[in-house]
Amino acid sequence: MVPTTHYTKSGDVHIAYQVVGEGPVDLVLIHGWTSHLEYQWEDPALARFLNRLASFSRLIVFDKRGTGLSDRVAERALPTLEQRMDDIRAVMDAAGSNRAAIFGLSEGGPLSTLFAATYPARTAALIMYGAYAKWIRSDDYPWAPTREEHEAAFKA
């Protein structure tokens, strides 16, 4: 069953979101690179994961601006990390969530970290999985993949 999709405004962009479950804690899940609210419920493994999260929380999921059911963005006006971070705030406001655990997956990690640092009073916990502090390896961060490793992964 696909939950009801709602929309809220963040600046001049409509952000699609869903709320699932009735647990004692709000949990905002921030997907990685792309997402699609309706498709995620069609993928059996992802649907099991989401249902498990919703079994102990009030799970709030959304499509980042430019992805899934949220408004598209112009190629020459790609969103900043700060704009996407403010989308989290807009979704939480629309869902009636004053404070939530923030769960960042992959590319959602930096976004989650920025939100937690900007809105500490609204962040009950910060959970990160598969996230990098930096996307590309550098002298001060030798643990990240190289540009060539990223490019090879996208070509595969």
Indicate where each model-derived feature is located:
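Structural signature of beta-strand start/N-cap positions in the alpha/beta core
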Residues: 58, 99-101, 125
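Short aromatic-enriched loop/helix-cap "lid" or pocket-rim segments at secondary-structure transitions
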Residues: 40-42, 72-74, 137-142
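Conserved HGGG/HGGXW glycine-rich cap/lid loop of the alpha/beta-hydrolase fold
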Residues: 7-71
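Short, hydrophobic/aromatic-rich segments at coil-to-beta transitions
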Residues: 1-6
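Short beta-strand immediately N-terminal to the catalytic nucleophile in serine-hydrolase-like folds
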Residues: 102-104, 129
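Conserved acidic catalytic loop of the alpha/beta-hydrolase fold
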Residues: 82-100
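Flexible "cap/lid" loop of the alpha/beta hydrolase fold
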Residues: 113, 117, 123-155
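Gly/Ala-rich beta-loop-alpha elbow adjacent to hydrolase catalytic centers
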Residues: 104-108, 112
